[in-house]
């Protein structure tokens, strides 16, 4: 089975993130504080997914994947793209840009239009919505031959855990960069490459 191995890899990654992001200092401006709040929420969702998976509560773990992705993308956009007026609107709970627009503006800003995030949105978004909003993707995995319970294929669980690991690691990298932890960049890049190369 793939999922126990992937779960252990995720748990070890979460420990690494916690050890390397604890106690970081950040500028206290609105842009930074809003962005790091999003990244911290993303990392918390990553840990929640691991915890839920350890108890075989896969439906709830899968439902959090979209929320994790949204937390990450909002943080990226707030930090790199939002105008002062948009930051103020966000603080009032009135951000009127959809997920794809946030991705497009962020990828354009960093010079990678139609990049990794766009590809993720194209390939995974419909199923993530289905899991989060109790659509067919979620409901169709609630039946087994003998009883009503979650029935998630092992390879799907492993893939979900891998996605959670990668998204949380991106959030952690943003925290390191925003706190000017240049001495950790090489270690971070090695860890990210190692994680990506051993993904199941």
Residues of each region from the PLM?
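N-terminal, Lys/Arg-enriched amphipathic/low-complexity engagement segments
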Residues: 1-38
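Amphipathic, well-ordered alpha-helical segments in soluble domains
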Residues: 13-17, 38-48, 64, 71, ...
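Substrate-binding/catalytic groove segments of enzymes
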Residues: 123, 132-143
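Short non-catalytic regulatory patches outside canonical folded cores
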Residues: 19-34, 50, 54-58, 63-127, ...
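Amphipathic alpha-helix face/heptad-repeat signature
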Residues: 6-9, 38-41, 64, 117-120, ...
